[in-house]
Amino acid sequence: MKYTIPCLFGLEALVADELRRLDLKNVRAENGRVHCDGGPADIPRLNINLRCGARVLVELASFPAPDFEALFQGVAAIPWEDCIPRDWEFPVKGYSISSQLHSVPACQAIVKKAAAKRLGQAYGCETLPETGDRYQIQFALIKDTAAVYLDTSGDGLYKRGYRAHNNGAPLRETLAAALVLLSRYRGRDPFCDPFCGSGTIPIEAALIAKNRAPGLDRRFAAQKWQSLPAKLWLDAAEEAMDQEFHGQYDIWGGDIDPSAVELSRHNAELAGVDDCVRFEVADAGKFHRDSDYGQLVTNPPYGERLLEKREAEALYRSFGKAARTLPAGWRVLVLSSHTEFERAFGRSAEKKRKLYNGMLKCDAFFYHGGAKTEPDKG
């Protein structure tokens, strides 16, 4: 079976590494998605274990589609009756990039019509009831080549099940996990987020430290598939739980807003990591730690979303002064979409990496503690 894992731009290498660790074969990455080969048992394994992928798609076919007739015939050739029961719903969604068939609604209609014709012929009926559960069909048209998939995940994998409410502009859990992994945190050193918001980054750090699979507390679309035995899901969950660590961890989140801290504590409890994460009301401008080593990973408020630009820059300036008090053994990673972040922070990044939080373009700025101040030229 061929799988495709869509992901936020910039996370492809992390997703590819996750797939290799899960022993998937023929892993290959391209912009915004990673492909691999596996068996039916890998559907639950991927959904339960992936931290940075957006969802798990089973590729059913790939074929040239320069026109509607080619698209129709390619979709109609797929043995839909082997996977979609007679009365199940099969909605269609997709996208088109650099293709002659650029109208997504028109392509959706063609894919739906072709799949319905094939199913109608197989089940001997002109009209399909679509009263049962859902098989979500997806397609991607890229440079006149169509790929057709079934979505095994349902809700995106960033929905871990622990964040019932958000405050302000949320950071996707998949991106939060990616930031933690990019910081090279593995659970041994102190970990801090002085702008914790709803607690997503510290919670994802705790899940990584404990090696707890992020999908254990939610359900997936493919759990209802008749073609996928329930035992595969039970085996995948048991395998994941057997690999959990149980230790003591120094993970801390702070926020100046008491309601954010309370929400973070609630979310940590839902995630099952409240025993290893502390949340406190704290001012990021006064952040300080004496330990020789540690990771600081944070996503301060973006000027264009939560604060006026001038307020945001003042916040970055005071936070930058605090970060410079950290010992040289600390690694600092800050995610921001602010184009003048480095100037306001008072230091040029040692390394930068382009990332996206949904459709919002950001940069991950990498530093070490103890660096000298650079003059603010603004």
Language-model regions, residue ranges each:
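C-terminal edge-of-domain segments
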Residues: 137-150, 365, 374
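Conserved S-adenosyl-L-methionine
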Residues: 171-288, 305, 310-313
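C-terminal catalytic and target-recognition region of SAM-dependent MTase-like enzymes
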Residues: 283-286, 290-378
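Flexible, glycine-/basic-rich loop-and-beta segments that form/coincide
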Residues: 45-52, 155-160, 164-165, 371-378
